[in-house]
Amino acid sequence: MLSCNICGETVTSEPDMKAHLIVHMESEIICPFCKLSGVNYDEMCFHIETAHFEQNTLERNFERINTVQYGTSDNKKDNTLQCGMEVNSSILSGCASNHPKNSAQNLTKDSTLKHEGFYSENLTESRKFLKSREKQSSLTEIKGSVYETTYSPPECPFCGKIEEHSEDMETHVKTKHANLLDIPLEDCDQPLYDCPMCGLICTNYHILQEHVDLHLEENSFQQGMDRVQCSGDLQLAHQLQQEEDRKRRSEESRQEIEEFQKLQRQYGLDNSGGYKQQQLRNMEIEVNRGRMPPSEFHRRKADMMESLALGFDDGKTKTSGIIEALHRYYQNAATDVRRVWLSSVVDHFHSSLGDKGWGCGYRNFQMLLSSLLQNDAYNDCLKGMLIPCIPKIQSMIEDAWKEGFDPQGASQLNNRLQGTKAWIGACEVYILLTSLRVKCHIVDFHKSTGPLGTHPRLFEWILNYYSSEGEGSPKVVCTSKPPIYLQHQGHSRTVIGIEEKKNRTLCLLILDPGCPSREMQKLLKQDIEASSLKQLRKSMGNLKHKQYQILAVEGALSLEEKLARRQASQVFTAEKIP
């Protein structure tokens, strides 16, 4: 009896089979499960094995390897039709069979891993079997008028072994792969083993172990991929960090350059010219805006050039007679003031178009020098001297550096002041006065000594500096003490006296070089209004900068004292309070 591989019909002889096959060749092949048509036999077999694996398995019971030989008594060798091994797809049911009742329940639930009826205990054997099924179409070879093919020896669907005869192959499968062909019955006591990783049920412990090993290999591969991914992530993170660091350094470098240029502009070291260039530039702006006639521009320019050539201040920013006016005011008014101490006579100098924004230190030096020039105690060291203009003051400070005073400060300013808008502070005024043999010293109030950032110790020091008489002294004391140079961050002013209120609070009297002449002229009126003194009076609450420095003049120096102070200025120090 011969069985058709296409439809399963059984015929009795080879001629009937050939005729039956011709019918299949002439008719359209239709899938018995989904009615697919229009494909050849090999494609239909592949379609059924892949798309209808479960249905095909449930519909047919397990069939053993079929080997059919056809032969005649006359010529058995030439007329042999070998329908090579057909391993029904249901053979996969025997690879590692689940319990029947479990397979029936899970048929519609789990098609991803267990394959509902594909109860394989050995994934490796299953893969080999699928390969053998792909080859099956080429292994089935029929000699005759229908197919002109050659005989191909049978191959084991599980391990790939090739035998010469089908009987040998059947024996091989039964002996070597008997465990894969066993189908556990519903009521048998065969032990079942669950995969701890995917839940697959196996009937053989060794097959389960191999199955689990496949899981472990897969996990190991995934871990390796994770490590590669992790290594790539670390490298990417390192590259991103390097790029971020590079951008940060570039940004810091850019900000540093900008800050340095800002400081250069702030302290007048940006090579934009000095007093002369700024004066001319600002006067040109005034002319362009219509605030200054061209004739006035040329007149002022000529006066400036003459002043610079002589090295003396032209006096156009000076206001004299302030101490005298204050003395009259306190004698006749100021009923809330208990006592007041005033410095020696001093002139006020305010900033001009040539030094606006940076010349406060120079103007305060002019105020202090104006007081010293009117004090007989300093005639010897300042004999024949006039108030210098700002470029001349810069030249005098450079000369003091050349003598050896304060080399560190000179280095910070590149040993150059002329032609720049560089600020000067208490240190530069100190070395200039010392080079002129004027005795002075600097006191550094480096932190606040009172509540809310105030400096009561500063007020006490200035009071002690000016006061020298007891309770019996008059209300207004005009001392012979020169004004005090007062420096803080970004600005400097001149202290010309101190008030003591009836409630014992203290108030400094301060001249500001930023105050224009028209405001100072209000103090020279016969009847000074109390509001006019508002620009001079500074209470403790008005002085809240973090640090203050004062420079106080104490007399004249001998030549030996000057040399000693020059040597001491190599490492500049100041008295600190507290």
Swiss-Prot record:
UniProt-listed Pfam families: Peptidase_C78 (PF07910)
Active-site residues from the entry: 360, 491, 512
C2H2-type zinc finger span: 2-24, 29-52, 154-177, 193-215
Location in or out of the cell: Cytoplasm; Nucleus
Family annotation (SMART domains): ZnF_C2H2
Region zUBD/ZHA: start-end pairs: 249-274
Protein keywords: Acetylation, Cytoplasm, Hydrolase, Metal-binding, Nucleus, Repeat, Zinc, Zinc-finger
Site feature: Involved in the stabilization of negative charge on the oxyanion by the formation of the oxyanion hole: 487
Source organism, top-level taxon: Eukaryota
Entry's Gene Ontology molecular function annotations: cysteine-type deubiquitinase activity; zinc ion binding
Task performed by this protein: Deubiquitinase with endodeubiquitinase activity that specifically interacts with and cleaves 'Lys-63'-linked long polyubiquitin chains. Shows only weak activity against 'Lys-11' and 'Lys-48'-linked chains. Plays an important role in genome stability pathways, functioning to prevent spontaneous DNA damage and also promote cellular survival in response to exogenous DNA damage. Modulates the ubiquitination status of replication protein A (RPA) complex proteins in response to replication stress.
Protein name: Zinc finger-containing ubiquitin peptidase 1
Species annotation: Homo sapiens
Taxonomic lineage from the root: Eukaryota, Metazoa, Chordata, Craniata, Vertebrata
Gene: ZUP1
